[in-house]
Regions:
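Acidic/His- and Gly-rich active-site-bordering loop/insert found
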Residues: 23-44, 48
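Active-site/substrate-binding loop(s) of hydrolase catalytic cores
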Residues: 23-24, 39-41, 52-60, 67-128
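Short glycine- and acidic-rich boundary segments immediately preceding or forming the N-terminal edge
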Residues: 1-32
Length: 128
């Protein structure tokens, strides 16, 4: 079994890319469902903070290089494309999406960019 895609095919994302919406500034929101998903499969997120783009570059290289049939986890390459484009930690609304996902331990506070309630931001609602 081949682990990597041929170099000539690595310019494009592998087949199976799905759109789940558009960002506030109109960027496509895409995810890569795992062809080899199971009950143990997880979700890999990158690009949550737009000013931390190394995860997007690394994950993009992995998606373009690895054979899709080996991918056991679902992938969202860039949760916050507007923040990545603008070089901001937050999204286009000024919300830190990492502090906005619904969680049992979510609480209000003085954390940078925290919003008023969990899962209020449309970018997070589209993902959950």
């Amino acid at each position: 079994m081949t682990v990597t895609r041929p170099r000539a095919e690595r310019g494009a994302f592998p087949p199976g890319t799905e759109h789940y919406g558009r960002s506030l500034l109109g960027a496509p929101l895409i995810w890569f469902p795992a062809p080899a998903a199971s009950r143990e499969s997880g979700l890999i997120l990158a690009g949550t903070h737009g000013d931390e783009n190394s995860s997007v570059v690394t994950l993009s290289c992995a998606l373009r290089t690895l054979t899709p049939s080996l991918r056991r986890h679902h992938v969202v390459l860039c949760v916050n494309p507007d923040g990545c484009q603008l070089g901001l930690r937050a999204n286009a609304n000024g919300v830190d999406l990492n502090r906005n996902f619904p969680a049992a331990n979510w609480k209000e506070g003085e954390t940078v960019y925290r919003w008023n309630s969990a899962a209020e931001e449309r970018d997070v609602v589209l993902l959950t």
